[in-house]
């Protein structure tokens, strides 16, 4: 009953046979078969995580983000590998990398160089080469968030000197305009720069991974 009104996240130790024996010797009680426990979680709509890092990530998302209207994701990535990994993660967790509307594709294509192709994931690197770092983020976010086929956005950035502007300030405007559409940011790069962006983004309620 709790899971219908408030998200319930569980991290269970003792998944393997060895782990179950260790749990039994520690608590003196029998451990539940992991497949049975997994089935119970799915039936009760309980979110099961695999490790402490995933637990923190999931709880952070619930703490910062609104519940999206659906599972349709637009991925905006400044690195090909980052976009592909985001698409893989969406597939793994039941999210749909949605087909963007024709209007959105046309809008993106008009700002791309001749060799660029609009799609989802949105490859923002060609946009960056054409219009610059800040404008490429703004244009991509605006196009994705205005699309009725998009419920949430995953933005994958690379920490480089060209991104040394206040990304949080830019994104905060979109949060105000589209409060019902969650925005999640992933940053790849040097720790010092990543930490700086992370602090500013999470201050405005945008989780960074």
Model-derived regions: residue spans:
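Charged helix-capping and loop-helix junction motifs
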Residues: 138, 166-172
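Short amphipathic alpha-helices and their capping/turn segments at secondary-structure boundaries
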Residues: 2-4
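Short glycine-cluster motifs
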Residues: 20, 69-158
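Peripheral docking tails and interdomain loops at the edges
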Residues: 10-98, 170-209
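Short glycine-rich, flexible loops that bind phosphorylated cofactors or substrates
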Residues: 161-162
